């Protein structure tokens, strides 16, 4: 399907359910209804998996992108009685930056976006409406119950695969210090949020969001970045990228738009997103001053924070750790400061020779965050942009500052996670995790990869997924995906899918290594289907059924090939699984155990060996000519 390029194309976003799948729901209390995806196997089994796609893969759901998604949380928010609606700030043309367009198409999108926007809501005077604030007061919110049900999933189908005590003991994970429960309870979720070890990013102005948790003691999550640039992409294309990203497994999405119509793009994305949305507010603030970093002011930035909080952004990347005293530490780096936000603020600090205004106004930022329940994603503006800059003084000086700011945020009960690198060779990854836990008090870590090598342009999603799997196992709570276009250009729809699949692999590998309950059951179901040559089930249990089916059908396209007990790799005579099945069939026919059958085979082979030796051990036996 081509990316949409007209307003009406927003009515036909990607809606197809996955093959052999349907949306199912686990019910809780107070209207808690958690969606999951059920995969029907050809042997009658039902496998249920975590689902990030929202209502888009539910054929029974009615979706009109011009109206936005239905609310999940409005009733919960209103029932708490600690918020109020208000008129909100007046939208101005500058909100869409200095490069906004005035074409008829954009004006139509902008007008429709104005209708999309809900009446903003905020905490009542002097109030605090964060999930951390509730958690620290012993309140279990519906959002926390939702998370517990979602993390558990439906486990009945797993019993067949997890019942072998010897196997489970042999394959037990190493949690690397994490404390992962066998069963998630709402009380466990509350305690993790209260301690700051987990966050539930859920702005009160984003009632459409399906609550999820980011934390070391939960399943490893992934984030996908979308957003336009000054040179490419449209609003319609970015909304389709959002839907496409969550289809393939993005738990969160960041809108990193830096080009035209930033405000309008964000309206469309937030209102149509069932997953938390993050932004980097400094990008829009920079657009408001015409792209001149030194013209940024606290007043402009503060106004931008409120604007985005009213729209419903769930977490802000804020580069408050890029401090004036640290900038000189980057002077001898091979690649300097590679973070866009970090470089903007470094330039501002050097130009004015003043401390970063995000650092000096941090407590004021906390006041805004707690009025809307926007979570901090404390940005790593001094992250290494190459392997040779990894783990240097600048990176770790900033990390220590982020730990200090975390405690300030927690003083205000503001949920906080910490962003991390970047480019880190494999042997230095553990040190990154150790330093983060040490200085940031177990706040969730959120890393970009890291990329383990620098020589893979076009394949950086692979180079980084290696590092992502490692650091996910070590304790990182969320992995920010990298696409094949990293360092090369703005990713398109296919790049987004490739990046997400690479990172779903990394996150799942980390969950298995950590011993996350039930993580391996889907793999066992796949292995069983593979051994039994149930080709359709193999496709449908995979992370990407479409590609798996296409690859198989390139060489064996006929329907009859889906029943064959071989593939094109080995053919019918050399398939190891077919040979093993033949041994088992022989054993069953003879009334033997599999071990006895193998012993029979070995005995027969020994007899043939003895016969060969008795004949002289010659490979070629002379043949006496027949006399005429």
UniProtKB/Swiss-Prot annotation:
Pfam family membership, one: ThiC-associated
A GO-annotated cellular component: cytosol
Pathway: Cofactor biosynthesis; thiamine diphosphate biosynthesis
Binding site for Zn(2+): 423, 487
Alphabetically ordered keywords of this record: 4Fe-4S, Iron, Iron-sulfur, Lyase, Metal-binding, S-adenosyl-L-methionine, Thiamine biosynthesis, Zinc
Leading EC class: lyase
GO biological-process terms attached to the record: thiamine biosynthetic process; thiamine diphosphate biosynthetic process
Binding site for substrate: 225, 254, 283, 319, 339-341, 380-383, 419, 446
Record field: catalytic activity: 5-amino-1-(5-phospho-beta-D-ribosyl)imidazole + S-adenosyl-L-methionine = 4-amino-2-methyl-5-(phosphooxymethyl)pyrimidine + CO + 5'-deoxyadenosine + formate + L-methionine + 3 H(+)
Gene Ontology MF: a single term: 4 iron, 4 sulfur cluster binding
This enzyme's EC code(s): 4.1.99.17
Essential cofactor(s): [4Fe-4S] cluster
Keyword Iron-sulfur: yes
Cofactor note text: Binds 1 [4Fe-4S] cluster per subunit. The cluster is coordinated with 3 cysteines and an exchangeable S-adenosyl-L-methionine.
Residues the entry annotates as binding [4Fe-4S] cluster: 567, 570, 575
Gene3D superfamilies in the cross-refs: 6.10.250.620, Radical SAM ThiC family, central domain
Alphabetical list of InterPro entries matching this protein: ThiC, ThiC-associated_dom, ThiC/Bza_core_dom, ThiC/BzaA/B
The keyword Nucleotidyltransferase appears for this protein: no
Quaternary structure, from the entry: Homodimer.
Task of the protein: Catalyzes the synthesis of the hydroxymethylpyrimidine phosphate (HMP-P) moiety of thiamine from aminoimidazole ribotide (AIR) in a radical S-adenosyl-L-methionine (SAM)-dependent reaction.
Family according to the record: Belongs to the ThiC family.
Protein name as it appears in the record: Phosphomethylpyrimidine synthase
Naturally occurring in which organism (per UniProt): Leptothrix cholodnii (strain ATCC 51168 / LMG 8142 / SP-6)
Gene: thiC
């Amino acid at each position: 399907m081509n990316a949409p390029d007209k307003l009406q194309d927003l009515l036909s976003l990607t809606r197809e359910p996955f093959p052999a799948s349907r949306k199912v729901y686990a019910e809780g209390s107070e209207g808690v209804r958690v969606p999951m995806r059920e995969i029907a196997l050809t042997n009658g089994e039902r496998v249920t998996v975590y689902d990030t796609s929202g209502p888009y893969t539910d054929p029974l759901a009615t979706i009109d992108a011009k109206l936005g998604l239905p609310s999940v949380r409005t009733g919960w928010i209103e029932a708490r009685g600690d918020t109020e609606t208000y008129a909100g700030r007046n939208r101005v043309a500058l909100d869409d930056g200095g490069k906004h367009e005035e074409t008829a198409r954009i004006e139509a999108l902008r007008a429709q976006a104005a209708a999309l926007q809900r009446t903003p809501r905020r905490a009542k005077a002097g109030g605090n409406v964060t999930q951390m604030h509730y958690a620290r007061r012993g309140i279990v919110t519906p959002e926390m119950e939702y998370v517990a049900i979602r993390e558990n999933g439906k486990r009945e189908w797993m019993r067949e695969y997890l019942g072998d005590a010897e196997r489970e003991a042999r394959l037990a994970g190493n949690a690397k210090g994490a404390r992962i429960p066998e069963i998630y309870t709402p009380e466990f979720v509350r305690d993790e949020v209260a301690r700051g070890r987990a966050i539930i990013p859920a702005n009160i102005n984003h009632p459409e969001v399906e609550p999820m948790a980011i934390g070391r003691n939960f399943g490893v999550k992934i984030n996908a970045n979308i957003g336009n640039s000054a040179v490419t992409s449209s609003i319609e294309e970015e909304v389709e990228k959002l839907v496409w990203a969550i289809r393939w497994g993005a738990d969160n999405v960041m809108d990193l738009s830096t080009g035209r119509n930033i405000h309008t793009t964000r309206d469309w994305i937030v209102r149509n997103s069932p997953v938390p949305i993050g932004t980097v507010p400094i990008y829009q603030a920079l657009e408001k001053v015409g792209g001149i970093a030194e013209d940024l002011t606290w007043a402009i930035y503060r106004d931008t924070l409120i604007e985005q909080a009213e729209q419903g952004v769930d977490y802000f990347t804020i580069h408050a750790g890029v401090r004036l005293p640290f900038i000189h530490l980057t002077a001898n780096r091979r690649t300097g400061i590679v973070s866009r936000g970090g470089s903007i603020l470094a330039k501002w600090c050097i130009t004015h020779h003043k401390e970063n205004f995000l650092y000096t106004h941090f407590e004021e930022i906390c006041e805004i965050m707690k009025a809307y329940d926007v979570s901090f994603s404390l940005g790593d503006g001094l992250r290494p942009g190459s392997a040779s800059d990894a783990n240097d003084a600048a990176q770790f000086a900033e990390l220590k500052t982020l730990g200090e700011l975390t405690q300030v945020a927690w003083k205000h009960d503001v949920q906080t996670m910490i962003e991390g690198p970047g480019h880190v060779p494999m042997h230095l990854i553990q040190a990154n995790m150790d330093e983060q836990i040490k200085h940031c008090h177990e706040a969730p870590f959120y890393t970009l990869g890291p990329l383990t090598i620098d020589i893979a342009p076009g394949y950086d999603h692979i180079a980084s997924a290696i590092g992502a799997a490692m650091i996910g196992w070590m304790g990182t709570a969320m992995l920010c995906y990298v696409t094949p276009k990293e360092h090369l250009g703005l990713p398109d729809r296919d790049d987004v899918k490739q990046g997400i699949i690479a990172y779903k692999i990394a996150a799942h590998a980390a969950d298995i290594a950590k011993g996350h309950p039930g993580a391996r059951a889907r793999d066992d179901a796949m292995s069983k289907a593979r051994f039994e040559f149930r080709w359709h089930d193999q496709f449908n249990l995979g992370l990407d059924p479409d590609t798996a089916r296409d690859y198989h059908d390139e060489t064996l396209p006929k329907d009859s090939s889906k029943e064959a007990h071989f593939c094109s790799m080995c053919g019918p005579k050399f398939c190891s699984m077919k040979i093993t099945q033949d041994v088992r069939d022989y054993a069953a026919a003879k009334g033997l155990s599999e071990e006895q059958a193998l012993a029979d085979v070995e005995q027969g082979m020994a007899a043939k060996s003895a016969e060969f030796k008795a004949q002289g051990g010659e490979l070629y036996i002379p043949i006496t000519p027949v006399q005429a």
